[in-house]
Swiss-Prot record:
Keywords: Acetylation, ATP-binding, Magnesium, Manganese, Metal-binding, mRNA processing, Nucleotide-binding, Nucleus, Phosphoprotein, RNA-binding, Transferase. The record marks 152, 157, 327, 398, 531 as: Interaction with RNA. Mg(2+) 1 binds at residues 112, 114. Its cofactor is Mg(2+); Mn(2+). Mg(2+) 2 binds at residues 112, 114, 166. The modification N6-acetyllysine is found at residue 2. PANTHER family: POLY A POLYMERASE, POLY(A) POLYMERASE GAMMA. The gene is Papolg. Pfam families: PAP_central (PF04928), PAP_NTPase (PF20750), PAP_RNA-bind (PF04926). Belongs to the poly(A) polymerase family. GO terms for cellular component: cytosol; nuclear body; nucleus. This is Poly(A) polymerase gamma. Responsible for the post-transcriptional adenylation of the 3'-terminal of mRNA precursors and several small RNAs including signal recognition particle (SRP) RNA, nuclear 7SK RNA, U2 small nuclear RNA, and ribosomal 5S RNA. ATP binds at residues 99-101, 108, 112-114, 166, 227, 236, 245-246. The lineage of its organism: Eukaryota, Metazoa, Chordata, Craniata, Vertebrata.
Amino acid sequence: MKEMSANTMLDSQRQQKHYGITSPISLACPKEIDHIYTQKLIDAMKPFGVFEDEEELNHRLVVLGKLNNLVKEWISDISESKNLPPSVVATVGGKIFTFGSYRLGVHTKGADIDALCVAPRHVERSDFFQSFFEKLKHQDGIRNLRAVEDAFVPVIKFEFDGIEIDLVFARLAIQTISDNLDLRDDSRLRSLDIRCIRSLNGCRVTDEILHLVPNKETFRLTLRAVKLWAKRRGIYSNMLGFLGGVSWAMLVARTCQLYPNAAASTLVHKFFLVFSKWEWPNPVLLKQPEESNLNLPVWDPRVNPSDRYHLMPIITPAYPQQNSTYNVSTSTRTVMVEEFKQGLAVTDEILQGKSDWSKLLEPPNFFQKYRHYIVLTASASTEENHLEWVGLVESKIRVLVGNLERNEFITLAHVNPQSFPGNKEHHKANNYVSMWFLGIIFRRVENAESVNIDLTYDIQSFTDTVYRQANNINMLKDGMKIEATHVKKKQLHHYLPAEILQKKKKSLSDVSRSSGGLQSKRSSLDSTCLDSSRDTDSGTPFNSPVSANKPSNPDSPTGEIERSSAEPVAVVVEKLPSVPPAQGLSIPVIGAKVDPTAKAVSSPAVCTIPTVVGRNVIPRITTPHNPVQGQPHLNGISNITKNVTPKRSHSPPTDGTSKRLKDIEKFIRLESAFKESRAAEDRKRKPMDSIGGESMPIPTIDTARKKRLPSKELPDSSSPVPANNIRVIKNSIRLTLNR
């Protein structure tokens, strides 16, 4: 009998459909306690408005039905105007497809709908942005209609009966569009222009994800929880270098493939388990990439050298496969890995009955994490200009993060995705002001009592990029300004209200750091880090409120000096070598002598999942306490010691850890050989273009030049060199850090 029951279990496991590029880690079915934890998870999410009621769902369906009818009417009319035969006009069709969070079934209350208008071959893109746009103009219930034709994915945005809709367009190389059209068929991409392929890609990826998960309802609930957690923890933003909705969906889908029968509460825990131990930059794949004869560019590090430098690749499952996380930087990956580890520790506590789900959804206190911040301010003179300006500046903040983390003295630059209204007292000229905050961790320097750090060029390169982009697209108007200021944590109250800055209830990591076992480590870190509070800031820009509200005291016991330059533009006259008039002036960056190996992108040294899985290699798993060797704990201190951290007081029991390691070990043995062929070779190559040790051309101003940008920003680098060799520097930020 025992043998028969064992055979029955094996047969049932063989019959279960296999998802993903490896076999599952566990086929265990949920227990009663798992369902209880899942219901508690649902209850914890309800106050955040993640679930729509039946009435709201039906309203969305009605709106989409109206839009679908409008599209069919428009395509029929335009077919008739192009003298197609009546028999063809009657059957030409047309259809609206949804994608994104709405198609996945995880949209929240009030969320917009991403939709795709699919038209037959005789309908041009220009028709969509002209005649269909005009048709929408005269439609009842449509408000805030605007077209963004020059976007990466061209789109028409509008509000239809209270529902915001982003509508993109694609025409297929077929004569009619039937209601049962399947966009997952790769042949639909044949003979299409790149804009149509991009428009179709959203639907194709979304549909493919849903086809690659074992249980759609469990996937949706798990994804709702993970997306809410990511938003609450400040790591939900593709634009700023974190992850967007599609990337989070693919990570959750991969977790569902590894634990196909698990309940949502278990899957949330396993999500943190898998990705806190993932060896980036190994790619996350939902299926093996498929070959196609369409010759479209796909993500493939073996072919494309630039793909080898992606830090956190998550590959879309639909052809042409792309990396959805190309914006991720070293700093944003570091922050996310730390959050994965924090999430694992919290869910361990929850599933042990020591805590509840609300703890997982607690926001971090970003303004208590770091000792140093950069305040980025975007201002404009009118509300309309401000909305445009803020959108452009925000889209370029990741350029600033990249500049800062390439600075040899900076370990981490952490941008808070939330923007804040500016203090009007400090920006009396402009009534519309937005601020972003970047937490900075400075790197220690061996055998140095103090270090002079100049961030001027990092900031100026960023502001030049934004102004130049605005000028190129004719957006730049009078009153549009960017300012960057260095402030210390104790100065933040000049910028933000007390309720935002006040210390919240201690987080799990704060509790662990305050435990006695970590006191010795903290003191050793402080003694080897130049990120102390006794630093000297000699370059805070003119607009810092500190200079106006807190006079410097040179006789203070700590020797702290806080002085700010009094003018917005620092004019530095230097004896520079003569330069021919036709050439630009090249000034080396401060600290240009950088060891190339120190600035190259490298894989984190987490030793939990081996990079190469060989036939004769038995994976050996260790569990380092630091997220990445040499990676900073996100508390404003650069962690560069190799000491082993004592076991945290809230760590799970040893037997639980052992079980988790067995799960991961099983996963390792089954992991795909997709990455084997290139891992060893590619890791030897380092991106030289990310090294910050080369000279940067500093643009100069010709005083005889008649045309100036409205923003008074520096002109482009082709400007002639003035005869008096005066270098104009804006947003000057210089500071001195003492040990």
